[in-house]
């Protein structure tokens, strides 16, 4: 907890150094009814925008899937890798390393104009998750490869680490450009605050719904491999549908030139 508090403190200090952008907004209403009305106006604007709906759909799926995957990894570690809870938490950290790497790679390689080119990576990520369902620690011999800070990396766990790094990398690689595009469209069509409010509402609703579904499957004692396969296929199929929707939008009207336009 102390480490987390320290990180938040450092983040707050960084925020203090952010320069004033000069943006000034009119005084906001405090009437709850009017605020709710304004929120849903922004909600519909962003979902109806051809670029906004694609990026919002992807980020919404990502946060819901990401939160659920954290719990799936723990269950997978218990049933397939013979790990306890603390050992399973290490797998979550391994996945986070992949996400960070993919995010940095995307930031250095994908310009805003090319953001939508990363959509197929979401399909690949979903299919890669399905591979988790077929791997078990007993498939390979167990012997120590190397030690990192007192943590022993065994040979039969190496595929699990590599798989989670790959899944995390793909997730970070496709969500960063989508988030950048969403922030851009939100800035153009609404405002930074209204856009973030709509984004957070959708993302948290996605987290809630997907975790409820996962909890139901666990309560029904559905085998973990089936849960993992269903989860991976859901992500892959949803991303495929998003791609088809984008292609249909482009067939009707080329909206890519809107990327980079000034605020209305």
Locations of regions flagged by a protein language model:
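Structural signature of the two symmetry-related core transmembrane helices
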Residues: 117-132, 229-232
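Helix-loop junctions on the cytosolic side of multi-pass membrane transporters
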Residues: 4-30, 112-113, 136-140, 243-254
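Hydrophobic alpha-helical transmembrane segments
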Residues: 1-24, 93, 97-98, 125, ...
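Substrate-agnostic recognition of the 12-TM MFS/MFS-like secondary transporter fold
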Residues: 1, 5-8, 54, 62-70, ...
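Helix-to-loop junctions at the C-terminal end of transmembrane segments
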Residues: 101-116, 217-218
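Juxtamembrane intracellular "pre-TM" segments in multi-pass secondary transporters
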Residues: 20-56, 80, 145-154
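C-terminal ends and interior cores of transmembrane alpha-helices
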Residues: 124-153
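A single, central transmembrane helix in multi-pass transporters
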Residues: 1-2, 44-101, 119, 124, ...
């Amino acid at each position: 907890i102390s480490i987390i508090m320290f990180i938040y403190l450092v983040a707050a200090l960084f925020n203090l150094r952010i320069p004033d952008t000069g943006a000034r907004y009119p005084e906001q209403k405090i009437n709850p009814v009017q605020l709710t009305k304004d929120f849903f106006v922004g909600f519909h604007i962003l979902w109806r925008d051809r670029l906004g709906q694609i990026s919002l759909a992807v980020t919404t799926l990502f946060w819901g899937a990401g939160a659920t995957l954290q719990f799936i990894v723990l269950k997978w570690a218990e049933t397939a890798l013979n790990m306890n809870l603390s050992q399973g938490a290490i797998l979550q950290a391994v996945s986070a390393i992949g996400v960070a790497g993919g995010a940095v790679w995307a930031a250095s390689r994908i310009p805003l104009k090319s953001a939508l080119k990363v959509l197929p990576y979401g399909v690949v990520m979903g299919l890669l998750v399905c591979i988790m369902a077929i791997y078990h620690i007993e498939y390979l011999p167990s012997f120590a490869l190397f030690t990192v800070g007192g943590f022993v990396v065994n040979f039969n766990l190496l595929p699990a680490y590599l798989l989670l790094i790959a899944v995390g990398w793909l997730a970070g690689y496709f969500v960063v450009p989508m988030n950048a595009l969403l922030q851009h469209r939100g800035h153009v069509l609404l405002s930074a605050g209204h856009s973030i409010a709509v984004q957070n509402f959708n993302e948290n609703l996605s987290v809630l719904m997907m975790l409820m579904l996962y909890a139901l499957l666990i309560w029904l004692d559905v085998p973990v491999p089936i849960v993992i396969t269903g989860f991976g296929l859901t992500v892959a199929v949803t991303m495929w549908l998003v791609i088809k929707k984008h292609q249909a939008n482009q067939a009707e009207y080329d909206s890519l030139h809107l990327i980079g336009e000034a605020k209305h």
